[in-house]
Amino acid sequence: MEDEDKTAECQHSKPPTGITHEAPPHHELQEERVMSLRGTDRSEPTEGSNLLTSGEKKPQDSPTEPNGLQSLRRFLACPPRGCLARVITNGTMVVLLWAMVWSVTGPECLPGGNLFGIIILFYCSITGGKLFGLIKFPTLPPLPPLLGMLLAGFLLRNIPVINDSVRIQHKWSSSLRSIALSVILVRAGLGLDSKALRKLKGVCVRLAMGPCIVEACASAILSHFLMGLPWQWGFILGFVVGAVSPAVVVPSMLLLQEGGYGVGKGIPTLLMAAGSFDDILAITGFNTCLGVAFSTGSTVFNIFRGILEVVIGVAAGSFLGFFIQYFPSRDQDNLVWKRAFLVLGFAVLAVFSSVYFSFPGSGGLCTLVMAFLAGMRWTDKKSEVEKVIAVTWDVFQPLLFGLIGAEVSIVSLRAETVGLCVATLSIAVLIRILTTFLMVCFAGFNIKEKIFISFAWLPKATVQAAIGSVALDTARSHGEKQLEDYGMDVLTVAFLAILITAPIGSLLIGLLGPRVLQKSEHRTEEEVQGETSAHIQRKPEDSITEA
């Protein structure tokens, strides 16, 4: 019986036929791979990972130091890092730049010298712009840094102790401002879009031309009767203050566009597109009136001379523009740098040579036309050239606004002159706001949006700084005291226009934008893709038909 029971147990313990407990070798390898993948991808603990994690000591067990002590240790680290390292680096660069120039020029780079004044003005303007850029208010766009640059130059000129050491000759100041004007005109010409020019209709054309022309005429009339300027100088003043500032409008519009305000009706796009054409119209009108004001002879001759300057500027700009389109050729090395150098070089040459040949109004037009025609063919590399020009502008912007501020002296200003300038500017700005409101009527905007566009078309800065001193420099080259007084009045109004309208316009845009503009709903890409996939699942035949 025991043998039979053992036989039965052995039969029960044997597996059924065709089934074995031993897995083949390749099956064991697959199991090992699966276990290794689980240990890595699914982060399941294994013996090896447990040993590794147990052997690592995390620094969380150590006592933490206060945040202030940690910041102090980082600040006093050796070698220095962070903020202290930046301060040391920038300070070394400033001292090194001065030392290099001093080693070449000698006394010119010592206090009271011309180059010393330029270097101090440059760094003070940069510092002022940085400080103003740090002033930020919630729900408001940042203050434009150009205000800090303008005030830095103004303070350097009007603080007695500093003014004795920081002196810049008029010739150097005029030349640097003219170079900055060339850079601005190149940026304006390259920024024009030929397709947008063809599509500009209706409200965009009215917004670009109407307020500028009306404000220029109003300023000319007011300055003639209130300030006693001749009609030619009145229109010079009018076109100086008639331009809107992209340096203030564009950053503010980008902030509103990111928040979705006014995007449904394209208000930010409209203002940014029309702003460029508004500036070009003001610069063109200024150059034409400048040529008429400094020409001699009869009125009919002066009118024909102004027309001749326009023709010369357009013709020279067309020739240079077509030349730069093909030279350098596309197969050359460093194509972007060569194009940027040629367009900047020809721009500076056009601005300076036009004054030399007594056609001051043709240089700006030549630069605008040249840059526009060159950019039409640079479609593939145009943005890269614009980046190089933008870097050049970053260098000359502090010089331009600092030099404009340094031209205004409190001692030479009379209270009645400032009062008349403020009155002329204020009335002209009110007329501009009303004109802008009328120009956007019958364009599909409600009353709140019309009010917003009217106030957004207020700030003035870049163009006023660029051309505000050109008339004064031209008058100084003629050596007539009366013309210099007229030029100083124009510069004073330009200075006050920047100082008053730039911060007020920026604040009004930031305050009114979120309150009066309709906010478009922002949908993420996942939501859009989800809606698209759901639509395809519901109507697959429609999507096939559309494809």
Swiss-Prot record:
GO terms for cellular component: apical plasma membrane; basolateral plasma membrane; endosome membrane; lysosomal membrane; mitochondrial membrane; plasma membrane; recycling endosome; recycling endosome membrane. Residues 105-113, 162-171, 228-233, 291-300, 358-361, 412-417, 474-486 are extracellular. It is a multi-pass membrane protein. It is found in: Cell membrane; Mitochondrion membrane; Endosome membrane; Lysosome membrane. Induction: Not detectable during the early stages of osteoclast differentiation induced by TNFSF11/RANKL. Up-regulated during the later stages of osteoclast differentiation. Up-regulated in macrophages and blood mononuclear cells treated with TNFSF11/RANKL. The modification Phosphoserine is found at S49. One of its GO terms (biological process) is positive regulation of osteoclast development. The keyword Transmembrane applies. Na(+) binds at V244, G275, D278, D279. One of its GO terms (molecular function) is sodium:proton antiporter activity. The chain crosses the membrane at residues 87-104, 114-133, 145-161, 172-189, 201-227, 234-242, 271-290, 301-324, 340-357, 362-373, 391-411, 418-440, 462-473, 487-509. Homodimer; dimerization is essential for SLC9B2 activity. Lipids seem to play a role in the stabilization of the dimerization subdomain. Belongs to the monovalent cation:proton antiporter 1 (CPA1) transporter (TC 2.A.36) family. The subcellular localization of NHA2 remains controversial. Was initially thought to partially localize to mitochondria. It was later established that its predominant localization is in endosomes and lysosomes. In another recent study, endogenous SLC9B2 in the distal tubular cell line mpkDCT4 is detected in recycling endosomes but absent in plasma membrane. Inhibited by phloretin but not by the classical SLC9A-inhibitor amiloride. PANTHER family: PTHR31102, SODIUM_HYDROGEN EXCHANGER 9B2. Electroneutral Na(+) Li(+)/H(+) antiporter that extrudes Na(+) or Li(+) in exchange for external protons across the membrane. Uses the proton gradient/membrane potential to extrude sodium. Contributes to the regulation of intracellular pH and sodium homeostasis. Also able to mediate Na(+)/Li(+) antiporter activity in kidney. May play a physiological role in renal tubular function and blood pressure homeostasis. Plays an important role for insulin secretion and clathrin-mediated endocytosis in beta-cells. Involved in sperm motility and fertility. This is Sodium/hydrogen exchanger 9B2. The gene is Slc9b2.
